[in-house]
Amino acid sequence: MAQAPWDSLWLNGSLATMAAGGAAYGAIEDGAIAVADGRLVFVGRRADLPPGAEDRAASLHDLGGRWVTPGLIDCHTHLVYAGSRAREFELRLQGASYEEIARAGGGIVSTVGATRAASLDQLIASALPRLDALLAEGVTTLEIKSGYGLTIESERRLLQAARALGRRRPVDVVTTFLGAHALPPEFSGDGNGYIDHLCASMLPALAAEGLVDAVDVFCETIAFSLAQATRVFEAARGLGLPVKVHAEQLGLLGGAALAAGFGALSADHVEYLDEAGVRALAAAGTVAVLLPGAFHMLRETQRPPVDALRRFGVAIAIATDCNPGTSPVTSPLLMLNMACVLFRLTPEEALAGLTRNGAKALGLSDRGVLAPGLRADFALWDIGHPAELAYALGLNPCHAVVRAGEPRPPRAPF
């Protein structure tokens, strides 16, 4: 009986499969990858390929001795916005704190004004260069949050822009509604009133339009309380939407544990997370998403509790947190380095945070690891060892990217 054909076969490379529990990086030397219908159908040693494998493939590709990793997954971005907050950067360098700037009307609210004034086309055009920078460093899936509109019309426009970016470029975009990002001017002094409006009108309408894949809340003393976050999570649960949270960045409030109680996909930032919060994440299977770009830009000193996260088996993801105020970063490779240097992750842990655990933070079980049956999303790297991705700064060693089995336009011919 004839075997089913393969669309492509990739030979002569080393594979960092990022499979858990085996060799470091899940490494396979002299590896081979076979693809059919956008899925991986063989991942292993070339010597273990079945007889006639090369004749079975419609196309053969020589990896040229390069390393191959899963496509990178940036699980936390605010990629769509208008305006700049470079002036706030200057103010922080002069001693102003993030909280002081926010309470004085800067921060998120200042971006809201510029974003509300931008058209859909303008939002897409401004985000495309940021997206292209991520793609150039091997990203095949990313999350994009709303949260810079804070009215139903402008939040809709942000989510529509995010969806459009996924059509304009060869990348999968997961959308997150972050209407509970800051208090809009129209509801000044009335946080509960805004949450009423968000839960009763904004979220149901946008979810009904198919624009929302998940729901997030900024749960901090300068943003929304535990009680307000609870109401948003309950509304999301009622609509069948998963939740996540910005929590424990500026102090210990309990937002991460609260979100874990709702089975949250992730709790993000978590610099001030305590052991009880870590235990809650572990019990719920909630991912801790570390954001070293914001930590660096805000010159924070309280590091996330990495040792406790390891001890209790909490999956650790990392992301760019690309946003105009606290992490204007479009380099996932830089985040690998920062996660190691600032948070003391190992290079392998950091890479797992941008692959396997990044996928988990988005609720995606079909990617993030090179394994048969999963999506054929992978990146080719001109490196001698996977640790070089976190080690070297400035050069981009990404040779090419394959998404759903289809090569994206490479920087160099195969």
Swiss-Prot record:
Positions contributing to Zn(2+) binding: 76, 78, 246, 321
Entry EC no(s): 3.5.2.7
Keywords for the protein's UniProt record, in alphabetical order: Cytoplasm, Histidine metabolism, Hydrolase, Iron, Metal-binding, Zinc
Binding site for Fe(3+): 76, 78, 246, 321
Major localisation: cytoplasm
Pathway(s) the chain acts in: Amino-acid degradation; L-histidine degradation into L-glutamate; N-formimidoyl-L-glutamate from L-histidine: step 3/3
Cofactor(s) recorded in Swiss-Prot or TrEMBL: Zn(2+); Fe(3+)
Cofactor binding note of this UniProt entry: Binds 1 zinc or iron ion per subunit.
NCBIfam families, per database record: hutI (TIGR01224)
Protein name according to UniProt: Imidazolonepropionase
Organism: Rhodospirillum rubrum (strain ATCC 11170 / ATH 1.1.1 / DSM 467 / LMG 4362 / NCIMB 8255 / S1)
Gene name linked to the record: hutI
